[in-house]
Amino acid sequence: VASPGCYPTAAILQLAPLAANGLIRPDSILIDAKSGVSGAGRSPALPYHFPEAHESLEAYKIGQHRHIPEIEQELSELFSRRTRAGSTAWTRDAGNLPKIVFTPHLVPMNRGILSTAYCRLHNPTDISELHALYRDFYKGERFIRLHEGDTSPNPRHVRGANFCDLALFADRRTGWVITVAALDNLVKGAAGQAIQAMNLMCGFPE
């Protein structure tokens, strides 16, 4: 068992219900993610010290972040499961692998990730149907909290916890679906989900 990285955890969780049901156009996925300075790892570096990061916002590794292949790999698996179940919306044989545009940003907070993903669907779907889809997909998943209405996840509300908060919106003017995910990169994005996986492997309560 391998735990995914912090960015992939957010991206996969926020897009999994759409991908697993074959709703997303795989060539339309854009992800804009923001992480606190602890997301850069344990090694000290000048850009991550408080005087450098304070009152600053910077995009980095644009189009070449190491987590892009991991996100595409897992979304591909979700798409292919749907194909094997009988959908014709996507086939691995056709070479129609999902390709994402991913841009991470460093923000002046110690911990936390806020990921906003944009995608287009094969067919127009009412937002109430999409909310129902997410509720059904994550039914019984105690560490997933779904926001409905106009509220949006905030990393502050998951700090120190193993939760991933998700929200889903539809831009009727453009036809795009927007999902927002918030998690603590040091817990749900790292040690917390490792413990969660261990509990499942050992038969303990999750």
Which residue ranges define each predicted feature?
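Gly/Ser/Thr-rich loops at beta-strand to alpha-helix junctions
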Residues: 5-9, 37
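Residues that form or flank phosphate/diphosphate-binding pockets in enzymes
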Residues: 9-10, 125, 189
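Alpha-helical scaffold segments in soluble metabolic enzymes
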Residues: 13-17, 70-74, 133, 193, ...
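Basic phosphate/pyrophosphate-binding loop/patch that engages nucleotide-derived ligands
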Residues: 16-25
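C-terminal substrate-binding/catalytic lobe of Rossmann-fold NAD(P)-dependent oxidoreductases
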Residues: 27-30, 37-86, 90-179
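A short, charged, Gly/Pro-tolerant segment at domain boundaries
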Residues: 34-36, 206
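NAD(P)-dependent Rossmann-like dehydrogenase/reductase catalytic/cofactor-binding core
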Residues: 163-165, 170-206
